[in-house]
Amino acid sequence: MSQTDTITALATPPGRGSVGILRVSGPLAAPVARALLGKLPRPRQAEYLPFRDDDGTTLDQGIALFFPGPHSFTGEDVLELQGHGGPVILDLLLQRIVAMPGVRIARPGEFSERAFLNDKLDLAQAEAIADLIDASSAQAARSAINSLQGAFSGRIHELVKALTNLRIYVEAAIDFPDEEIDFLSEGKIEASLNDVIARLERVRTEARQGSLLREGMKVVIAGKPNAGKSSLLNALAGREAAIVTAIAGTTRDVLREHIHLDGMPLHIIDTAGLRNAGDEVERIGIERAWREIEQADHVLLMVDGAATPLSDPDMLWPAFIARLPSGMPVTVVRNKADLTGESVAISDISGYLLITLSAQSGVGMDLLRTHLKQSMGFTGGTEGGFLARRRHLDALETAATHLQQGKEQLVSACYGELLAEELRLAQQSLSEITGEFSSDDLLGRIFSSFCIGK
């Protein structure tokens, strides 16, 4: 679809509300205003006006705002109508606007996409709009605001600028090999490269924190029947999310809870007890349990401390350990310390972290919560932080790889051409984050996940 079309959409959620907002952006925003309002509102000044149908009858009345481009969110002429929030009246207004020649319904995220294409926002800032809307905690919302205001983009621009300056030196050494000073071997370039690598690593650390705030961690509670998995889910959730009985196999299906640990989203999944299935329903539940385990970020292996003195997973349940995906983080949770009299503690057993606690009484739960945060490297600090997506982490990792490869070329052989190429590729990877270097396919995937009116 053409970017020169005039687009319109609801900017508020569907359903009843006190206020409903319609947004129009494009070259026909002013003619739409004249047709609908009988006049063009003064720029950037709220006016209370009737919203009229094509026969002159009043459909609604409310606040009209007109923002001439380029001084608007999208960089185009923008009309905003704030009327009553009834779905019927909003639909009538939307039909009235779309009936005008040259106006169409906006695609998801098209307003933000136009803001990006018109240099009102870079890509990381545009993504921050969606992240702010989807924020599930106060910390995530604050970090999304920081990203929207350019905190993340600013760090990336600083790195790109440093890389640009470094490339100038390297290109000079390549283009003027007969100069008396050998820029590549004198140490200046290596020192500058090390500085950029260190700065990039600091940004990567902050980005990983931002990604945890946005995505959270998927923790699957697994174990044999009646080990206390559902009790642990309830203890972490702070409510009775799962039915708990003394009957083994009470949980037949996957149960999910979404909580926060000092701002970090935690997706807790309780699964059916793993054993040879007694019936078809239980067999299906166990299959689903294994699917969740295989996709987990972390597995909590529940052990019934009252039923066995063993805690070493390799001895206690070798078949379970053998089936886990390679490299899967596993924490052994030895439950029912209130019955066994064992001390609440964190220890190591055969390379696995072992936490002894009581899910029923809550003793030792703070140890588990702290461990879960530490296992993902979450620090909880958000002041000045920003949110990051998986694609941002991938781009930062790619840039770091190219810089390390460039350093190897410089230190081992002083190959200026190869170093210059690695620096160029690193800069390109960083530019993908802000959208200075992005494919149309990437832009389409990003903006299609936005709300219609954003």
Swiss-Prot record:
Keywords: Cytoplasm, GTP-binding, Hydrolase, Magnesium, Metal-binding, Nucleotide-binding, Potassium, tRNA processing. Residues 216-377 form the TrmE-type G domain. Gene3D superfamilies: P-loop containing nucleotide triphosphate hydrolases, Probable tRNA modification gtpase trme, domain 1, tRNA modification GTPase MnmE domain 2. One of its GO terms (biological process) is tRNA methylation. Coiled coil: none annotated. It is an enzyme of class 3 (hydrolase). It is found in: Cytoplasm. Mg(2+) binds at S230, T251. Signal peptide: none annotated. Pfam families: MMR_HSR1, MnmE_helical, TrmE_N. InterPro entries: G_TrmE, GTP-bd, GTP-bd_TrmE_N, GTPase_MnmE, MnmE_dom2, MnmE_helical, P-loop_NTPase, Small_GTP-bd. GO terms for molecular function: GTP binding; GTPase activity; metal ion binding. Homodimer. Heterotetramer of two MnmE and two MnmG subunits. Belongs to the TRAFAC class TrmE-Era-EngA-EngB-Septin-like GTPase superfamily. TrmE GTPase family. Exhibits a very high intrinsic GTPase hydrolysis rate. Involved in the addition of a carboxymethylaminomethyl (cmnm) group at the wobble position (U34) of certain tRNAs, forming tRNA-cmnm(5)s(2)U34. PANTHER family: TRNA MODIFICATION GTPASE GTPBP3, TRNA MODIFICATION GTPASE GTPBP3, MITOCHONDRIAL. This is tRNA modification GTPase MnmE. It comes from Sodalis glossinidius (strain morsitans).
